[in-house]
Amino acid sequence: MAKDKDITETLLTAAEERSDLPFLSVDDIPPITTVGGFVREFNVETKKLWYLAGPAIFTSVNQYSLGAITQVFAGHISTIALAAVSVENSVVAGFSFGIMLGMGSALETLCGQAFGAGKLSMLGVYLQRSWVILNVTALILSLLYIFAAPILASIGQTAAISSAAGIFSIYMIPQIFAYAINFPTAKFLQSQSKIMVMAVISAVALVIHVPLTWFVIVKLQWGMPGLAVVLNASWCFIDMAQLVYIFSGTCGEAWSGFSWEAFHNLWSFVRLSLASAVMLCLEVWYFMAIILFAGYLKNAEISVAALSICMNILGWTAMIAIGMNTAVSVRVSNELGANHPRTAKFSLLVAVITSTLIGFIVSMILLIFRDQYPSLFVKDEKVIILVKELTPILALSIVINNVQPVLSGVAVGAGWQAVVAYVNIACYYVFGIPFGLLLGYKLNYGVMGIWCGMLTGTVVQTIVLTWMICKTNWDTEASMAEDRIREWGGEVSEIKQLIN
């Protein structure tokens, strides 16, 4: 009787720990057998998703705008400054951003599932482990910033751009360490559905960034060093504000102070972080490669200019997909951690339907205004014509790229990073790129052929992920989430100890 009482008390304690979790289901949803039941649960889950996705989208847009605004002001310094900042932002910082964000994404799995299971005390330990690993990674990646000039020259950039971008890269070294703090901290807060505070902090950072950049560049005329100072300061402000929020006690048991446990089981944590990084980088670099391949075509200037406009639009629409990716990753990891497999599966379904509808709406708007919008970006008639020709495939890309990140978010939430990394290699690099190069160069379809071929790789990857999810036993995933929480927390389940 005493043992049964202890078991009951342990279960009640875990339930109480989760009782205040925003929008976390108390119980798993029942099997849905009617249309009315589907509509009711769909409405409930939609509110939960947008509670997370709305602020996440807002945060992504604000942080994306920091770099975009810096590039705008660079154009007021000189043409070479604009080129240098653009190259540093897309090549040097872009490479590092993919690795750091990917490694930080390991926390989406671990913190999300631990939070759903009520193991709140482990979240702070996971956060500190990720800080340790990402700061070591930042130290290694800083070599890329230091030697950016010769590296850029070796891949075909002009001497002037390579030199200017190399100097600017050295100025931007603090940013990589800001990433090392920001990305784990963001995942830590996201897993607890504390998205609104991130949105507010990013908005304040953007509001400060714009006038401060103007003052430093226009009034003080600090040039490129001034751009670096302000951009670094903006990212440091975001980090400091998030840390103050966490250290002030607003996260409860999730943050109980610094612990030596952060240095335990680091190698296993590194493996999951690397798997997350590989999975994300393979996707980011895949789309960066389209611009690179277009640069070797005949009339490369026109092809690259037109493709850059399309990629710019695709990048802005991707902010919606990134927000939905964050939301579904949190929802799936939380519900699996709480042992709610049906709710996790239904959350995925709602996210896919919602993202697909958004993608169709945006695509239809582009197709309707295909004759008008290109002139907003460029005056060259040849570029405008090519952008119009590329608009149908841009519209299709928006739909696919709205769905694909949701599926990737499920993979992160469920802890499938390593498997998806192999899928990405096969679909993107073994199939997509060779097919795109075949269409673009061999069959002379140009930039349209390259894009179509590589988009086919994305379609294949989406189909494979969909098949994986359809074949998934969600009860097994919920059980694996419990095992993962115990393994990575270095602890044994209290309930199993009591039962044994």
UniProtKB/Swiss-Prot annotation:
Compartments reported by the entry: Vacuole membrane
What's one Pfam family here?
A: MatE
Swiss-Prot/TrEMBL keywords: Membrane, Transmembrane, Transmembrane helix, Transport, Vacuole
- What are the protein's GO molecular function terms? antiporter activity; xenobiotic transmembrane transporter activity
Designated name of the protein: Protein DETOXIFICATION 29
| InterPro entries linked | MATE_euk (IPR045069), MATE_fam (IPR002528)
Q: Please give, as recorded in its UniProt entry, the membrane topology of this protein.
A: Multi-pass membrane protein
Keyword presence, Transmembrane helix: yes
Coiled coil: which residue ranges?
Answer: none
Q: Which organism is it from?
A: Arabidopsis thaliana
| GO term, biological process aspect, one | xenobiotic detoxification by transmembrane export across the plasma membrane
Q: Which GO terms describe its cellular component?
A: plant-type vacuole; vacuolar membrane; vacuole
Q: Where are the transmembrane segments?
A: 67-87, 91-111, 132-152, 161-181, 197-217, 227-247, 277-297, 302-322, 349-369, 393-413, 419-439, 449-469
